[in-house]
Amino acid sequence: IDRQSELFAQLAAKKIGIDKSVIHMEMAGWKILHYVQNAKNCNFEKSNEQLTVAMKYLHRLHEVEPDESVKIFDNVAEGKKLMDIASATKGNLRKEFADLVEKVERLYPLVKADAKRLGYGLVLCHNDTYEPNYLYDEKGEIYLIDWEYTGLNYAANDIGCILCRYDWSDEQIERYLKTFVGRTLTEDEHRYYIAFIPISAFYWFCWGLYKGSVGDDDSFFFLPSYRNLVRFIDFALESYGEKE
């Protein structure tokens, strides 16, 4: 968590209208917020309208010009930090999950190179996008909340964060990707966005390891993130011509 990045993004979110709950925030993390009357979590599986608005919010965010206070959020580097912290109580996790770590370390440079080829740079990202962080009020107004993980990242991470934390079918995943991009993806785009799912999953898998190491419930993120990491990592590597 980087409070400078969070502060910048939270105020930007207020300005561009994707989190109208904000009144004031300070560097220490204290916030004054409007009370959101009868707030509920969005349900993207049941509401195409909510999903469409949620994806539009991400595009608005990604168009914000960040200042020098916003730090880079590197999924793989940050994930390995959490894994190392968790190793203090869980044993040598780098060794236990050496195969997955090695594959992610091979995949990420390929994804970055593909992003450059496709013209995708680092943008302001939320980095913790999933249904519980999208609220709607009694009038249907949607709020994207919880900006603690904000940082510069590839826009694909903000859709990858959603896709890696649920056990969705290929058809469900395609619905989210098509809504995010706004059309049917090209073959190159599809390879890139699918390959980002295990990159996003790796961070939340490591986050789950960390939460478990400090006695918190780790199952909500750990299990689906782990399953999606395993499900997509080999497929992604093979899509870039990498074999076992």
Can you name each region flagged by the protein language model?
Residues L33-H34, Y143-L144, N153:
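Conserved active-site beta-strand element of glycosyltransferases/polysaccharide synthases
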Residues P66-N127, E138-K139, L229:
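An alpha-helical support segment within catalytic cores of ATP-dependent transferases
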Residues S87, G91-K95, D99, C206-E244:
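ATP/Mg2+ or Mg2+-diphosphate-binding catalytic cores
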Residues L124, Y143-D146:
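Pre-DFG segment of protein kinase catalytic domains
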Residues I1-V76, K81-L82, A88-G91, K95-A98:
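ATP-binding pocket architecture of kinase catalytic cores
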